């Protein structure tokens, strides 16, 4: 139903893992993984805004939001308030009231993520502090995104279950991806498994 609606609204092509009858008449870009493709296409569509930001990414079972706000406050002083924030509570894309709003996810969906990065860059932001949930990696919302600094706070079995991570190993693997994709890493010395 979404494809038919998009077609009615003027879509000129669609990206999917298979062709759909509702897309007849539209070019189909067939990919192996829609979520990964969406992240890469989002970055390209919005002109790779991440390349214009110094990005500090924070992951952990507990403490992401508090750490993000501490980092934001410290960097605000050294960047003359040219810092964006993507947290569980708020997204701040600039210094005007309309650039500050409540978040609906810890880490936004890929199109929202790159859109908001573009707005932040266009608003003169030079730095971004963002929380990165393990679900963001599991769902490939941030596929292809690299960070200047990655901070790994901790890990515990809080999010193990059928709705999030089936095993602790899966949760750990997702969180470790932040380290793999960071130029520099900070790891809490008290974190088990490290």
Regions found by a protein language model. Give the residues of each.
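N-terminal leader/targeting and accessory segments in enzymes
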Residues: 1-40
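Residue-level signal for inorganic ion chemistry
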Residues: 6, 41, 58, 86, ...
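Non-catalytic positions within long, well-ordered alpha-helices that form the structural scaffold/packing
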Residues: 7-8, 121, 143
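Acidic, Mg2+-coordinating active-site environments of NTP-dependent enzymes
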Residues: 16, 20-25, 122-123, 138, ...
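Walker A (P-loop) phosphate-binding motif
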Residues: 43-93, 98
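Flexible beta-alpha connector loops of hexameric P-loop NTPases
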Residues: 98-109, 158-166
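Conserved nucleotide-sensing/catalytic segment adjacent to the nucleotide-binding pocket
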Residues: 101-130
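Glycine-rich phosphate-binding loop used to anchor ATP phosphates in small-molecule kinases
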Residues: 124-138, 142
